[in-house]
Amino acid sequence: MGVVAPNGHGLDVFAQALREGRSGIRHIPELAELNFACQVGGVPEGFDAIRQRYFDHEKLLSLNDNIGYASVAAVDAWTDAGFAVPEAEDDRVDWETGVIAGSGIGGMDTIARTVVPMVNAGNVRRMGSRIVEQVMNSGTSARIAGLLALGNQVTSNSSACSTGNEAVIEAVARIRLGLATRMLAGGSEGASPYIWAGFDAMRVICRKFNDRPEEASRPMSASAAGFVPGAGGAFLLLEELESALVRGARIYAEVLGGMVNCGGHRMGGTITAPNPEGVRRCVRGAVADAGISPREIDAINGHLTATYADPIEVKNWSAALERGPEDFPWINSTKSMVGHCLGAAGAIECVAVVLQLRGGFVHPSLNCGDLHPEIVPYERRIPHSAVACPDLKVVAKAGFGFGDVNSCLIFRKWEP
């Protein structure tokens, strides 16, 4: 696995941040200068220095933040899995491995900062030959394929907040069908006022706590004031089990099953709100695909964005799993530490799930000491500090996005 998150780059740093409940949310001066109501965000620190360690000058010319976060995380996942990054001069192609790399908004920053001003100024010819690969939606997957010589399915997906989860589910399906041995799957999103402006205009991102950034992301809290925008990237290398065992790979966890669906913008569902029945069907479908009982789920890493939808989500989990407050699984929100990383959210949070399974702990959900009244019945299953769970075996990970789209994954700790 590989991760570039607002509160840490690399698995060890990120895992420690999760255990400690360390926030990566900071004040963003540019947002204040541009009169944003929300002036905080989750942005990976020191990324320019990080990517310069990975890529030569020529490659850096075509790496905006969206592609950069994805490329670093994918290379990290590749090497963590025990593979070497091939030399550019090596003509061999790995036909058994592909990549699905998603993003929610993609190259918007490059379009706004470079394409629009230069076109409006009549300077089209000065944009250079690298601009298209930075703004095309498949720029992330294409770049990763070139870095690692991948020859199987190489595509980019986009399903708003569900993107990262969906990439993993699609990759698992590809392997199950016998069409690939391995797939890199994940997502990324750049950090930019041009990406976040629409959400600020909608008043769905946090307009309070600008002077207390680490308190701004408040999933499940009665004082939640909207989500905090974030950025970053993460990838998981998924591999057919026999192949992984034969090569002696380090296996962190199994993907038991997954489900994607849409609520059809009915029964209360809209572009910006989920159809509760669609959410419940998605969770039940993932559990069925995993071949387990709902009672085997030990913990939930929720979508939980710090909006009005949080109590609705908790109730949907309870209904879908048929587990009330008395026997509800642990539930937490990684977004309380990193914000909502949009197309990268599901991928970063999947890595968080696997690290919790591997480490036998449930990370804290920050800033929810004042639980929403409708969530209070579940309070004993909401960790405010890290909880040691040596018997943690099965965790559900969900993503519910704009467009009334839903995704749910079931992970199980690997036990040979």
Which ranges hold each PLM region?
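Condensing-enzyme catalytic core mediating Claisen C-C bond formation in acyl metabolism
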Residues: 22-27, 212-290, 298-299, 368, ...
